[in-house]
Amino acid sequence: MSDTGGDRARLRRYTKLPVWVVEDHQEVLPFIYRAIGSKHLPDSNISFLHLDSHPDLLIPVNMPADTVFDKEALFGELSIENWIMPAVYAGHFSQVIWLHPTWAQQIREGKHCFLVGKDISTTTIRVTSTDSYFLSDGLFVPEDQLENRRPLQLDVILVEPYTLCSKQDDSDSVSSTKKPKLALGSGESSAAADGHSCSEGRRGDAVTPRSDHACQEPSCSRSGGQQSQNTATAGAILDILKTGDAFVLDIDLDFFSVKNPFKEMFTQDEYKILQELYQFKKPDSNLPEDGLVDVVEARTHQLEDLEAVFADLCDGDSEETVQSWASNPGMESLVPLVQSLKKRMEVPDYEMVHQAGLTCDYSELPHHISTEEEIEYLIQSVYFLLKSLPKPTLVTIARSSLDDYCPPEQVDMIQGKVLDVLHSLYGTLDTHLVYSEESPLS
């Protein structure tokens, strides 16, 4: 890790590795801020290693950027999908590494270099990234429209679980009946370690793409290649971590098994209508900047209109009200949607309907309920990856089970396996089960 100005040398050290386990993911941020305040983490240049089925890299759309400098006000504004970027704008995180499973493909693979800053026209936080993940939420602005710019290096890296093909030394694994090899996206070694650095003057979003996007089937003959991928990718992540002064390990348990809870709330036809109403068509990759501005403006108006529709329906969903909104271009399917909802429930939760719609842009939320075997393969992949990296300053874990993103029937089992991995790698832990009323320590 870097040692700029001796910052790292002046940091305090924990006797035992703190592990904070929360329910909703945004609840980890106060513990990271606490570590900054106690000088266990630096105020800036923190690397953030984020294992999750969701990027969590959106931004509270209407929150004034300066809210980040009032931490109590900030914590009250955050939700599960938008808690990381405010910490980037505040200057704390400079490198974010999103490690994702095969079923989560929300952001393009590779290295993304862009700016996070204050939009001079709206005073909200915005980015210069042109990835559809940000465009679909109306978060892109040109560089010259930002002030107080913070450069961010975002590396998106795929973690692939493979079954064990060759005999493996029991001493080099977490205790398990199945000990698969680590396999990570083969394109990532070049993407993350190509020598390209993010600079504050970069325009837009520089992306080094993956060389392959397909999920490859495990093969015993490929075990040597898998080990090479493991070494190369771990080395690339290590190079990224070296540019920071400290690193935080963050794990969402839905990384190992994930549900799209909205699929259980709505019928197939209702969900299809939501996809039609909220759809976002990805722009051409060669669209000029002014064209992207137009795309974002149109998308913002679309989302504002839909928010107004469902806010109005919360006040009253009479046939007259529904027909009035449905007469607008693109809103015709509102009539069958409301009719279907009212048949199934006495009082539809239109606010929840809107929240579900917001997830239906250019792709669906990931949905993959893993078998116990699949979970074990991913657990071992994570073990071998972390074994190649330095010890983090602290670990944060989100259960994500009360909102059904991590299957509630699996979450305790997954949590136990993750804590076993951490104990195996780092020894005695200072574990805080924040989600539990008793919050025991171990």
Curated annotation (Swiss-Prot):
Residue numbers spanned by region Disordered: 167-228
UniProt keyword Coiled coil present: no
Listed InterPro entries: UPF0489
Keyword Plastid: no
Residue numbers carrying Phosphothreonine: 15
Basic and acidic residues bias (residue ranges): 197-215
One matching Pfam family: UPF0489
UniProt keyword annotations, A-Z: Phosphoprotein
Residue stretches of biased makeup (Polar residues): 218-228
Residues recorded as bearing Phosphoserine in the entry: 285
Residue ranges, compositional bias (Low complexity): 183-196
Top-level division of the source organism's lineage: Eukaryota
Coiled-coil segments: none
Family: Belongs to the UPF0489 family.
The protein's name: UPF0489 protein C5orf22 homolog
Lineage: Eukaryota, Metazoa, Chordata, Craniata, Vertebrata
